[in-house]
């Protein structure tokens, strides 16, 4: 039986206009991916304490669809919080490689973004972007939980935009 849309009653047509949405599969994929982020916690210093605070009742990352995972195979976001030493760099890269695609990285704090106060030390990596590609940088020493939530929101916007347009965003 073929459905003739011209014979729909006006009140039913208005109901359809309010309750039916037309979109593309790419937009839906972007929406789903951005609202179900599962970060791998890679806390190395004081920034990790602030990251743990975002999981508490006051900030509650669950309302954004963010659920912390302990395994890289279950994660799609890596939050690097703290000082990365040259001895820790291969482990960081291995964890990143174990994450399934698509995957994103957030560098949280001055140490993860540029080396922080230990930038002149021979054993400190001068930014985690020398090891893995970083999508969002969150400055601060340490950044507060609200800054991490802002960074996660920016990552969500980036994921939706890239899914919608097919273009890569590199400056966040």
Curated annotation (Swiss-Prot):
Which compartments does it reside in? Cell membrane
Q: How does it sit in the membrane?
A: Peripheral membrane protein
The UniProt GO MF terms for this protein read: 4 iron, 4 sulfur cluster binding; iron ion binding; NADH dehydrogenase (ubiquinone) activity; NADH:ubiquinone reductase (non-electrogenic) activity; quinone binding
Keywords carried by this UniProt record: 4Fe-4S, Cell membrane, Iron, Iron-sulfur, Membrane, Metal-binding, NAD, Quinone, Translocase, Transport
List the GO terms this entry assigns under cellular component, sorted alphabetically: plasma membrane; respiratory chain complex I
Record-annotated residues binding [4Fe-4S] cluster?
46-47, 111, 141
Q: Which InterPro entries match?
A: NADH_UbQ_OxRdtase-like_20kDa, NADH_UQ_OxRdtase_20Kd_su
Q: Which Pfam families would you find in this protein's record?
A: Oxidored_q6 (PF01058)
Q: How is the cofactor bound?
A: Binds 1 [4Fe-4S] cluster.
* EC class: translocase
E.C. no? 7.1.1.-
Q: Which cofactor does it need?
A: [4Fe-4S] cluster
Q: Does the keyword Ligase apply?
A: no
The record, for NCBIfam families, names: nuoB_fam, PRK06411.1
UniProt lists the family membership as follows: Belongs to the complex I 20 kDa subunit family.
Q: What is this protein called?
A: NADH-quinone oxidoreductase subunit B
Its source organism is Brevibacillus brevis (strain 47 / JCM 6285 / NBRC 100599)
State the gene name recorded for this protein.
nuoB
């Amino acid at each position: 039986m073929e459905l003739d849309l011209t014979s729909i009653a006006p009140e039913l047509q208005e109901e359809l206009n309010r309750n039916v949405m037309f979109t593309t599969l790419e937009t839906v994929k972007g929406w789903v991916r951005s609202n179900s982020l599962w970060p791998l916690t890679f806390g190395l210093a004081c920034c990790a304490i602030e990251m743990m605070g975002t999981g508490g009742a006051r900030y509650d990352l669950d309302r954004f669809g963010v659920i912390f995972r302990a395994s890289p195979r279950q994660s799609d976001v890596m939050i690097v919080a703290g000082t990365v030493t040259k001895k820790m760099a291969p482990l960081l890269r291995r964890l990143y490689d174990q994450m399934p695609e698509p995957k994103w990285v957030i560098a949280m704090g001055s140490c993860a973004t540029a080396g922080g106060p230990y930038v002149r030390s021979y054993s400190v990596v001068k930014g985690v972007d020398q090891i893995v590609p970083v999508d969002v940088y969150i400055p601060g020493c340490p950044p507060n939980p609200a800054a991490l939530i802002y960074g996660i929101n920016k990552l969500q916007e980036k994921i939706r935009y890239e899914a919608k347009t097919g273009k890569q965003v590199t400056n966040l």
